[in-house]
Structure formats: C-alpha cells, structure tokens
Amino acid sequence: GLKDWWNKHKDKIIDVVKEMGKAGLQAA
C-alpha cells in the first residue's frame, strides 16, 4: 500500500523536497 511505498522512498523524497526548498529560498 501507500505506507509501504512511502517507507521505501521517503528518504529520497525528503532529500528532493529539501533541495527544492533550498532552490526556492535562493530564487526568492
């Protein structure tokens, strides 16, 4: 289910979100 998918991918997703957040802050 979704929870298994999230647990498998969450570390990568969190890294991507952090990178997008940094890029957004720099662009602002």
UniProtKB/Swiss-Prot annotation:
KW Secreted (keyword) present: yes
Record-annotated membrane-spanning stretches: none
Modified residues (Alanine amide): 28
Entry's localization field: Secreted
Keyword line: Amidation, Antibiotic, Antimicrobial, Fungicide, Secreted
Predominant location category: secreted
GO cellular component: extracellular region
Tissues expressing the protein: Expressed by the venom gland.
One GO term (biological process): killing of cells of another organism
Function according to Swiss-Prot or TrEMBL: The synthetic peptide has antimicrobial activity against the Gram-positive bacteria B.amyloliquefacies S499 (MIC=0.05 mM), L.monocytogenes 2231 and S.aureus ATCC 29213, against the Gram-negative bacteria P.putida BTP1, P.aeruginosa PaO1 and E.coli ATCC 10536, and against the fungi S.cerevisiae, R.mucilaginosa and C.cucumerinum. It is not active against the fungi F.oxysporum and B.cinerea.
Protein name per Swiss-Prot or TrEMBL: M-poneritoxin-Da4b
